[in-house]
Design a protein with these regions (language model features):
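Extracytosolic ligand-binding ectodomains
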Residues: 1-335
């Protein structure tokens, strides 16, 4: 069989999401379950130049059958437009349906916010926490995450309060509400860390929960001076019984100096694996690969299962892979 040629496209940026996704995709291409007969070219584009992504893709047109984008929502949306124009199978990690926009070539495998919210609420219902305060960033995405989470928690019988980011002078209402758990709904480490420290100054050792995007080595190191119970939304079984694919994934990252696998490592790994498997099934032809993907066949990955249809290019359903993980004494353990 002829080699499968895939382009890995990422912005020239130190954004942790793009860095982790591209590393996960690169390692999947080298050592993942679909790495045989796979050739990957990695290129970057200037995010401050609206035309640079198109120029990079134009250079590789006719030389690759698929493209993996380690890209944010606006970048992924543009990449999807270009993939449609150039007949490339395209995989990205975003969960926003605007990225797909009904394009046959585009598959987006991020976990939907509502699915994650329902899973987290179900898991928290099994704990001692019943009064949960949501502190969220003011971005559109995090406000939407907080709204989904608030609804899910209420539907699971818990008391919930929510508001956007607090500063030192704003903590009295939170103290009076007497939360069992504060869920810090932020993606940015530089924003989340000051909020966590302010909570500790004003509210003592109330339990904290952070989103899965903050479960990174750099953020864990920054938490060293923050005492108290600290949990994370997660998607891996850190100290339990991982699947064979998850174990191989974690061992591969560890061999390359990554001690804590992130969700974005996983999304990059699975995007590359799924794209390669589909193109292999389609003998390198994007149209045949899309037919295979849309047939509903289950793609098992380290981030869970995807089963795509013509009407669903996200492929996620049910409870999903969501777990809760405790950070305690320098170790991660599943709750």
């Amino acid at each position: 069989m002829k080699p499968i040629n895939i382009l890995l496209l990422r912005p020239e940026s130190d954004d942790p999401s793009a860095v982790d996704q591209s590393l996960g995709a690169r390692l999947s291409a080298l050592e993942g379950p679909a790495s045989s007969d796979l050739r990957v070219e990695e290129v970057s584009f200037r995010s401050d130049d609206p035309g640079d992504m198109e120029r990079q893709l134009a250079f590789w047109q006719g030389k690759v059958s698929g493209v993996i984008g380690a890209t944010n929502v606006p970048q992924s949306t543009r990449l999807g437009e270009l993939a449609e124009q150039t007949n490339l199978l395209c995989f990205v990690a975003n969960n926003n349906p605007l990225v797909w926009h009904g394009r046959g070539e585009v598959f987006h495998i991020g976990l939907p916010s509502i699915q994650t919210a329902l899973a987290v609420a179900s898991l928290l219902q099994k704990t001692r926490y019943r009064r949960i305060f949501l502190l969220h960033d003011q971005t559109e995405f995090q406000s939407r995450v907080a709204s989904s989470m608030e609804t899910a928690l209420r539907n699971h019988g818990m008391e919930v309060a929510a508001r956007s980011a607090l500063f030192d002078g704003d903590f009295e209402p939170v103290r009076e509400w007497q939360a069992d758990l504060i869920y810090v709904v932020f993606s940015s480490e530089s924003k989340a860390l000051p909020v966590a420290r302010a909570i500790r100054r004003h509210l003592g050792d109330v339990s904290l929960l952070f989103g899965r995007s903050l479960l990174r080595e750099s953020f864990l190191s920054s938490l060293a001076d923050i005492a108290g119970e600290t949990w994370f939304v997660d998607m891996f079984h850190r100290d339990g019984a991982p699947s064979r694919d998850q174990q191989h994934f974690a061992e591969t990252l560890s061999a390359h100096g990554i001690k804590v696998a992130t969700a974005n490592h996983g999304f990059g790994w699975d995007a590359m694996t799924f794209c390669a498997r589909a193109l292999t099934a389609g003998n390198g032809e994007p149209a045949l690969a899309i037919d295979h993907l849309e047939s509903g066949v289950a793609f098992e990955g380290v981030t869970g299962t995807c089963a795509f249809t013509p009407d669903n290019h996200n492929g996620r359903a049910g409870f999903g892979p969501t777990t809760l993980t405790r950070w305690s004494n320098g170790c991660l353990e599943e709750v």
